[in-house]
Design a protein with these regions (language model features):
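Short acidic loop-to-helix transition motifs that present clustered carboxylates
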Residues: 124-130, 172-173
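Membrane-proximal helix-turn-helix segments that form the acceptor-binding/catalytic region
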Residues: 83-84, 110, 129-141
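Conserved N-terminal ligand/cofactor-binding loop architecture of enzyme catalytic domains
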Residues: 1-83, 88
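A short helix->loop->beta-strand "cap" motif at the edges of active sites that frequently abuts
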Residues: 91-92, 115-118, 139, 160-163
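Active-site proximal beta-strand in glycosyltransferases
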Residues: 93, 97-98, 106-125
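Short N-terminal targeting/anchoring amphipathic segment
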Residues: 83-102
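Structural motif
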Residues: 1, 97-100, 124, 145-147
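A nucleotide-sugar donor-handling region in carbohydrate enzymes
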Residues: 73-75, 137-174
Length: 174
């Protein structure tokens, strides 16, 4: 389980990212979420979420939300299981082999970062940056298919430096 505050900040970060990026895929996700808000309570929540994300749908706002989400995830963690496992194993690197946008690895990546263990992930497809939402949390290293994806990653995420991104060609990770 994770902190409700961390989850709320992560949702707002993802929503603000989509609104800032405003790709066709982001517009479609926005439309689908509007459609899913099919009760008065859900509609009100959706309106509040959209209204609060709009002022943050810019690079400075996204950076602020990233810092807040990181602090909330790190300081309000409800379990030390990942951190304890990493202390026992003492890995040189924590690699997220699941989808980069999957929330399955979020707590483990935050725990690794808190312990100073480098993190890495792979972008599985050319459209992951524009159709799947925000990468949360940010990693220390990224493996990408080609130079175009590398450049797009660096453009969308100004906090990522070029030396953190490695072009590996298309890969299948088992």
């Amino acid at each position: 389980p994770e902190s409700h505050i961390a989850r709320l900040l992560r949702d707002q970060l993802d929503l603000a990212h989509g609104r800032w990026l405003w790709s066709e895929a982001a517009k479609e996700r926005w439309r689908l979420r509007d459609h899913e808000a099919n009760t008065p309570v859900k509609k009100l929540k959706r309106i509040v979420k959209k209204a609060t994300c709009l002022p943050l749908a810019n690079p400075a706002g996204l950076a602020l939300l990233e810092r807040a989400e990181h602090l909330a995830s790190s300081r309000l963690a409800k379990s030390d299981a990942d951190a304890n496992l990493f202390r026992d194993l003492n890995p040189a690197l924590v690699f997220n082999g699941s989808h980069v946008h999957s929330r399955n690895a979020t707590q483990a990546v935050h725990a690794a970062k808190a312990l100073g263990i480098p993190t890495a992930t792979f972008l599985f497809s050319w459209d992951n940056l524009t159709s799947q939402g925000r990468i949360i949390p940010l990693y220390d290293y990224y493996l990408v298919w080609n130079e175009q994806i590398r450049e797009q990653l660096l453009e969308i995420y100004p906090a990522i430096r070029s030396e953190q991104v490695f072009v590996t060609k298309a890969s299948i990770i088992c």
